[in-house]
């Protein structure tokens, strides 16, 4: 529209009036060979389970977020889309659903607000002498941001889910929280996803699991739940209640984050 300018970002951050101006179609290429950013962080765990930071570039998608500005302090909502460039040539994604979560990096990885990191709470505990040699990694977790619960630990994000055939199953904004017990300290953490009117919709679209049911929350479990998923598969043909799940390859702010179960 006349008088509006479109600004965009490629790192998950919210577009501002200082973000790059969209003036012509973007030329996007597969960013997988670029250096790791989020998966290179060390402050996402207190676990002593031999966490190894990836020493080669992980697969990456292009996450584009855009918003319109009128120059008078008003802006539209943010539109986000994740592009998986040349992934049809990557065997690891054959016969697998793909899920993308995009959120402002501050929401996950900043020292003050990030829910995926040890954060400022951990640093304050260090300074106060609450952290000392002999504490287990589970005890250390008490002083981290990823151990926070409740609404204060919820952050806005954009969710996209594509089926094994590439069909879009979900594409909407939602809230995310870290979930679990000791797995909160794992580098690959589980999430709870919340659909709320203030983000976009009151419920997730009822296309999942062939139930016709709309869900206001979904669980995105890390690969630690593989054993549970295996047990479910053993009894799914019997008259027993089992948890429905969708195995999916997850990308967090464009970086590959591993296999999860939705």
Question: Model regions: which residues?
Answer:
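Conserved ATP-binding subdomain of kinase catalytic cores across diverse folds
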Residues: 101, 126-262
């Amino acid at each position: 529209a006349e008088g509006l300018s479109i600004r965009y970002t490629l790192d998950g951050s919210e577009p501002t009036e200082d973000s790059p101006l969209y003036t012509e179609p973007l030329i996007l290429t597969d960013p997988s060979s670029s250096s790791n950013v989020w998966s290179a962080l060390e402050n996402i765990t207190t676990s002593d389970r031999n966490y190894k930071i990836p020493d080669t570039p992980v697969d990456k998608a292009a996450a584009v977020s855009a918003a319109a500005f009128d120059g008078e302090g008003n802006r539209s909502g943010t539109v986000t889309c994740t592009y998986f460039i040349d992934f049809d040539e990557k065997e690891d994604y054959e016969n697998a659903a793909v899920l993308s979560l995009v959120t402002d990096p501050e929401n996950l990885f900043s020292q003050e607000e990030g829910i995926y990191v040890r954060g400022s709470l951990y640093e304050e505990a260090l300074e106060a002498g609450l952290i000392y040699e002999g504490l287990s990694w589970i005890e250390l977790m008490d002083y981290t941001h990823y151990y926070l619960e409740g609404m204060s630990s919820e952050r806005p994000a954009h969710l996209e889910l594509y089926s094994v055939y590439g069909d879009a199953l979900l594409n909407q904004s939602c809230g995310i929280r870290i979930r679990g017990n000791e797995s909160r300290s794992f580098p690959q953490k589980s999430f709870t996803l919340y659909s709320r009117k203030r983000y976009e919709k009151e419920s997730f679209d009822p296309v999942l699991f062939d139930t016709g049911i709309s869900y206001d929350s979904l669980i995105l479990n890390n690969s630690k739940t593989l054993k549970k998923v295996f047990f479910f598969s053993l009894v799914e043909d019997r008259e027993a209640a089992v948890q429905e799940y969708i195995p999916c390859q997850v990308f967090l702010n464009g970086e590959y984050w591993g296999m999860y179960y939705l």
